[in-house]
C-alpha cells in the first residue's frame, strides 16, 4: 500500500491541522544554505544572540551536580519562585506557587490551556494577524477558531466593537498576544481595559500570550489583563524564557493562572510529557534571577534593527510598514505588489511573493497567509545589521 493509502487511518484532528509555515520556511532556508546557497534568512522566530553565559553555566553546573532526573511535574519550587519574582518585577502581577506550572516551552503551556478549557463546539476568538499555532491548537482541542481580521489602519489591533461582534454563546476563550507575533503590535492599558469591559461577566477566559513582554520599544510596555482584579480569575498568562533570554532550544515556558486551571494543565502534562527538562529549569532560574542588563542591551539592539528595517522597507515601491512596538518582526503590507509580474510570474498572494524572494533572490521570509494576513509578509530582524542590509538590497532589486 502507498503512503497515501495509509493516511486514511490518521485521526480527524490531525487531518484538520496545518503544518507550521514558519518552521517549514526556516527548514527550507537551512536546507538551501547547507547546499551552499547564499540565503539570508529572515524567517526564524528566535533571537540571533547566544544564551547568556550565566545561564549556560547554571545548566552545566546542574549536569555536573547530577540534577538530571525527573522533577515535580509542574516544575521545581526554585523556578516557580523565580517566575513569581519576575512577574512581580516586570509585569506587576502577584501569583502563588500553586498558580504556576512550568512546561516544555511556551507552545506546550498554550496547548495545555486549550486542552484544559475547550470541548467540541466551543469557540476561540483569535485576532488576525495571529501566531500560526493559535488556530491549530484550538482545532487540536476540538474547538472552533473564530478569526477577527484587523487592519493596518488600527495598527493590527482588535477593537472593542470587533470583539463584541465576534462573541456568541459558544465563546470560550479570547486569545490576546501582546506584543504580537507577527505584527509587533502592543495593546496599551486603555486598549486592554476596553476589551475586558466587553467580556466582563460573560464567562469568557482570556489567554494572554506575553512571550515578548521584555522586547518593546520607545518606552512602550504591554499591560496584562491579569492586572485587572475583576478579570484575574478569568486570565491565563503564558510566558517563557525563549525570546528575552535567547533560550529557544532550552524549552522552558510557563503559565500563571487560577489554581484550578493549573491543576488541570498539570494533569494533562503528567500524561503527555511530564516535567520540563531538569537542566533547563535550573538554567531558567539563573536567567530570571540573574543580571537583567543583558536583556536591556539586546532590546536596544533590536530597536536599532527595527528602525533600520522600517526606514528602508518603506522606501520600496509596493511595500508599506507600520512601526512595530514590540517583538522582533516587521509585518509589511505587500498589497501594492499583488497582481504584478516579477520573475515571469504574477504575484497572486503573499505565498507567491515569499517563494519568489526565496527561490530567485535567496531571501527567506514567511508569507502572511500563515498568519491570516494574505497581503503581508513577516520578516524577522533577529539578524545583524549587515545581514538585514543585504536582505533589503535583494528585496529592493527583486521589485525594482
Curated annotation (Swiss-Prot):
Cofactors named for this entry: pyridoxal 5'-phosphate
Q: What is its main location?
A: cytoplasm
| One Gene Ontology biological process | amino acid metabolic process
InterPro entries per record: Aminotransferase_I/II_large, AspAT/PAT-like, NHTrfase_class1_PyrdxlP-BS, PyrdxlP-dep_Trfase, PyrdxlP-dep_Trfase_major, PyrdxlP-dep_Trfase_small
Origin superkingdom: Bacteria
Residues at which L-aspartate binds: 45, 131, 181, 378
Q: Where is this site: Important for prephenate aminotransferase activity?
A: 18
Query: Known SUPFAM superfamilies for this protein?
Result: PLP-dependent transferases
Q: What does this protein do?
A: Catalyzes the reversible conversion of aspartate and 2-oxoglutarate to glutamate and oxaloacetate. Can also transaminate prephenate in the presence of aspartate.
Protein name as catalogued? Aspartate/prephenate aminotransferase
Q: State the species of origin.
A: Chlorobaculum tepidum (strain ATCC 49652 / DSM 12025 / NBRC 103806 / TLS)
